[in-house]
Amino acid sequence: MATNPTPRIGKAQRATKESDIQVEWNLDGTGKTDIDTGVPFFDHMLTALGAHGSFDLKVHARGDVEIDAHHTVEDTAIVMGQALAQALGDKAGIRRFGDAFIPMDETLAHAAVDVSGRPYYVGVGEPEQMLSSVIGGHYATVINQHFFETLALNSRIALHVRCLYGRDPHHITEAEFKAVARALRAAVEDDPRVGGVPSTKGTL
């Protein structure tokens, strides 16, 4: 739990002809989630993100999932990134960097985060089958990379996600989401040794 007297909460919403998204993200939460995107497996992943990041996360989304889940997932990432950026504020007192290795059965994933204000994404190591696998009839695993990249760009963080090895598309996806959750949790935690913004430039 952060020592901030006021919880760091970001709220954002976005409505287009393809989707309608509302997000509330509390960085100083306890892992409570309220997720409803119309894509059950994506709900499962966002629930894991909140729970393992110890974030209170509310995501309500409606999109054209009867056509494809891609619009809903990518638009949700946009709004989540905006909410995360708002919650981070001036970033004073945070650790800034975080990383995590997460195993899931035969899979091992790693994520590293720099809350730098310089958005960048690198995703490597997913096996070729992730380009064509579909989970639950709606979630195409090729969307993983789009989600993480869009989240990073809109929250203005540098995010690196690696699948070191794995076979099952479900396990690979879940390990990646949990690794991002843990890395982000570490990066946004209060650092009692840092009184201001964790940068030699004085700003992030």
Curated annotation (Swiss-Prot):
Transmembrane segments: none annotated. Keywords: Amino-acid biosynthesis, Cytoplasm, Histidine biosynthesis, Lyase. PROSITE patterns: IGP_DEHYDRATASE_1, IGP_DEHYDRATASE_2. The keyword Lyase applies. It is found in: Cytoplasm. It catalyses: D-erythro-1-(imidazol-4-yl)glycerol 3-phosphate = 3-(imidazol-4-yl)-2-oxopropyl phosphate + H2O. Belongs to the imidazoleglycerol-phosphate dehydratase family. Its EC number is 4.2.1.19. GO terms for molecular function: imidazoleglycerol-phosphate dehydratase activity. Coiled coil: none annotated. The keyword Amino-acid biosynthesis applies. GO terms for biological process: L-histidine biosynthetic process. InterPro entries: IGPD_sf, ImidazoleglycerolP_deHydtase, ImidazoleglycerP_deHydtase_CS, Ribosomal_Su5_D2-typ_SF. Pathway: Amino-acid biosynthesis; L-histidine biosynthesis; L-histidine from 5-phospho-alpha-D-ribose 1-diphosphate: step 6/9. One of its GO terms (cellular component) is cytoplasm. This is Imidazoleglycerol-phosphate dehydratase.
